[in-house]
A protein has these predicted regions:
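Conserved nucleotide-binding and Mg2+-coordinating catalytic segments in signaling enzymes
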Residues: 34-53, 74-80, 86
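Catalytic core regions of nucleotide second-messenger enzymes
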Residues: 103-104, 133-147
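Hydrophobic scaffolding residues in well-structured cytosolic catalytic/regulatory domains
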Residues: 33, 51-52, 58, 110
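Catalytic-core segments of nucleotide cyclases and related cyclic-nucleotide turnover enzymes
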Residues: 120-127, 153-183, 188
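Short helix/loop segment flanking the catalytic signature motif in cyclic-nucleotide metabolism enzymes
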Residues: 80-84, 112-128
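Short glycine- and acidic-residue-rich catalytic loops of nucleotidyl-transferase/cyclase enzymes
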Residues: 103-109, 113
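Active-site-proximal structural segments of metal-dependent nucleotidyl cyclase/transferase enzymes
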Residues: 54-80
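A short pre-motif secondary-structure segment
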Residues: 94, 101-104
Length: 188
């Protein structure tokens, strides 16, 4: 009887092993796809989708606990190459706390979410970011420069789009200053 059952047992074990391998491969593939869906390939920072999700969650948290939060947009403002975009992302990541989030929104545009952060605390963080960005150089050796616009939300906005609109307004003010690197801040 064992002789007749042994091939069936071996086949069953092989099938279970094959299924286990397939499930593990599928899990690895899903984890990779989740990462690709939320991270920017070039820089390794979060992408716009991940920012929208995190900002939406922060709006809800701010509404529930009545805490302020801050957001800053960074625009490198010139046509820059991949190396400078990667360096800017690294400088931004290096100047943030573990609870903060940096995301790349466009070619040379980044946005930083500072949960439970007041305007004075956000300005301290932004000064660190600005210092890190000030060290970046273009190919010809000139400073890269950046415009930074931020908003502290004392009352949570209704939607993420309001965050984007408010930071875009601050960026426009920073660019209008005409300086190489300028920060504007507002409380909403």
């Amino acid at each position: 009887m064992l002789r007749t059952c042994l091939p069936i047992i071996v086949l069953a074990l092989a099938a279970v092993g094959g299924l286990t391998w397939a499930v593990m491969a599928l899990r690895r593939s899903l984890a990779r796809e989740r990462r690709l869906a939320r991270y920017d390939d070039l820089t390794g920072v979060r992408n716009a989708r991940a920012f929208h999700e995190a900002a939406g969650a922060e709006i809800e948290r701010a509404r529930r606990y009545q805490h302020p939060f801050s957001v800053a947009a960074i625009d490198l403002g010139i046509r820059v190459g991949d190396d400078l975009v990667r360096a800017a992302a690294a400088a931004l990541r290096g100047g943030l706390r573990a609870t903060d989030l940096v995301a790349r929104l466009g070619r040379d545009e980044f946005i930083v979410l500072l949960p439970e952060t007041t305007a004075p605390a956000a300005r301290i963080v932004l000064d660190k970011l600005r210092a890190g960005l000030a060290e970046l150089r273009l190919i010809d050796g000139r400073p890269a420069g950046a415009s930074i616009g931020g908003v502290t939300f004392l009352n949570p906005p209704r939607a993420v789009e309001e965050i984007i609109r408010a930071t875009d307004e601050r960026i426009a003010e920073a660019k209008a200053s005409g300086t190489l690197s300028h920060v504007t801040w507002n409380e909403a």
